[in-house]
């Protein structure tokens, strides 16, 4: 695992974003760990978070004209990433995010920010079953003439490498896009194995 990914994992542990116990996920399944990106809740946190997403976008070599945040947690992610791309990589890119509810007055519509055209990258916090990603992609395609070239998430929390390949390959093939994560559950396992004081948490994720 490269240095900046380790820095991100340290950042997650410092902010207690990665928790262990018993948690019910949106899919209805129970998980022994939970990634709560809502705990990145200060200006300093968002500056750091934006850098890690921006770095992942740069490393991905994806072709894009705008970045899109999936409401609600994707909203601060996409804004901080747009700022980080400009600050750290001198890339001035427009952003957009969706509303959960259709607005019928003022600017109206389903989206806020740049009008969705051309190739975009989707930003979200986690991926488990892929159901949320499927819903978001279908929603965007039903409301905008655009092409999603890739998806960037903070954590791929798929339980094992076989599942990861299946879920990602299915989505990538279905929508002709690429999925990248800042870290995966396998990165966390390998990192914890190297840190004695973190061995206690391995029982939750292996």
Swiss-Prot record:
Keywords: Glycosyltransferase, Magnesium, Pyrimidine biosynthesis, Transferase. It comes from the Bacteria. Its EC number is 2.4.2.10. It is an enzyme of class 2 (transferase). 5-phospho-alpha-D-ribose 1-diphosphate binds at residues 26, 72-73, 99-100, 103, 105, 124-132. InterPro entries: OPRT (IPR023031), Or_phspho_trans_dom (IPR004467), PRibTrfase_dom (IPR000836), PRTase-like (IPR029057). This is Orotate phosphoribosyltransferase. It comes from Buchnera aphidicola subsp. Baizongia pistaciae (strain Bp).
């Amino acid at each position: 695992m490269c240095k900046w990914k380790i820095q991100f994992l340290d950042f997650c542990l410092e902010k207690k974003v990665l928790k262990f116990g018993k948690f019910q996920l949106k899919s209805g399944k129970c998980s022994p760990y939970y990634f709560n990106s809502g705990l990145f809740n200060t200006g300093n946190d968002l500056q750091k978070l934006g850098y890690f997403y921006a770095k992942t976008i740069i490393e991905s070599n994806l072709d894009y004209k705008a970045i899109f945040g999936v409401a609600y947690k994707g909203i601060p992610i996409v804004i901080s990433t747009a700022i980080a791309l400009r600050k750290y990589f001198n890339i001035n890119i427009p952003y957009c995010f969706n509303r959960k509810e259709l607005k019928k007055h003022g600017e109206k519509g389903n989206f806020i920010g740049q009008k969705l055209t051309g190739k975009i990258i989707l930003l979200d916090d986690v991926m488990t079953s892929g159901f949320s990603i499927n819903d978001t992609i279908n929603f965007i395609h039903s409301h905008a003439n655009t092409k999603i070239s890739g998806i960037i998430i903070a954590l791929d929390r798929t339980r094992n490498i076989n599942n990861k390949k299946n879920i990602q390959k299915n989505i990538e093939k279905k929508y002709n896009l690429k999925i990248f994560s800042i870290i995966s559950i396998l990165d966390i396992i390998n990192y914890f194995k190297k840190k004695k004081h973190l061995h206690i948490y391995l029982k939750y994720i292996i």
